[in-house]
Amino acid sequence: MQEKFEQSVKNMLEIIGENPQREGLLKTPTRVFKAFEFLNSGYKQDPKQILNDALFESSNNEMVLVRDIEFYSLCEHHLLPFFGRVHVAYIPDKKVVGLSKIPRLVEVFARRLQIQEQLTEQIAEALMEHVGAKGVGVVIEARHMCVEMRGVQKANSTTSTSALRGSFLKSEKTRKEFFTLINSAKQVRF
């Protein structure tokens, strides 16, 4: 598989008019393979296993929020990066998940070819399904290189998406609390 991938990179370099044999490009096919292997490593990870290994009994029934989780992903349309921050909240139902597992869950889905809308929904659905939360709220704010580097070339534009499930969707009070918390003392730095 690696050999086939590397040959494809060499072919691409030739198509754009480069010489894959010049010094600066000799190791590029291997580097690109390793980069893509890492950036798409989420396909080899099971969200259920990550979350179920860290579920703990709890009487807590108040909102748990992990804010400003940085992520990087590749747009499935152009294979260009998009990156930003994810805010994830849930209301437990007799079980809480280890806090470090929420950023790991984000990484599992971000390290797949993606669109931001789908990434937002996948995080919310995984928490609802595998943690058994009463509700989940996910907001992603991201910059897309397919918008900034090509096409309309609008630097520094930000795309925001949200996915609300359970009590976050049904209760205006819960929704308001979530959006207030993620916007309080907000400092967006990319």
UniProtKB/Swiss-Prot annotation:
List of residues binding Zn(2+): C75, H78, C146
Segments crossing the lipid bilayer: none
EC code(s) of this entry: 3.5.4.16
Stored InterPro entries: GTP-CH-I_C/QueF, GTP-CH-I_N, GTP_CycHdrlase_I, GTP_CycHdrlase_I_CS, GTP_CycHdrlase_I_dom
Pathway info: Cofactor biosynthesis; 7,8-dihydroneopterin triphosphate biosynthesis; 7,8-dihydroneopterin triphosphate from GTP: step 1/1
UniProt keywords, alphabetically: GTP-binding, Hydrolase, Metal-binding, Nucleotide-binding, One-carbon metabolism, Zinc
Cellular component terms (Gene Ontology): cytoplasm
Domain of life per record: Bacteria
Reactions catalysed: GTP + H2O = 7,8-dihydroneopterin 3'-triphosphate + formate + H(+)
Gene Ontology terms for molecular function: GTP binding; GTP cyclohydrolase I activity; zinc ion binding
Assigned protein family: Belongs to the GTP cyclohydrolase I family.
PANTHER family: GTP CYCLOHYDROLASE 1 (PTHR11109:SF7), GTP CYCLOHYDROLASE I (PTHR11109)
Subunit and interaction comment: Homomer.
Name of the protein described by the UniProt record: GTP cyclohydrolase 1
Protein source organism: Campylobacter lari (strain RM2100 / D67 / ATCC BAA-1060)
Taxonomic placement: Bacteria, Pseudomonadati, Campylobacterota, Epsilonproteobacteria, Campylobacterales
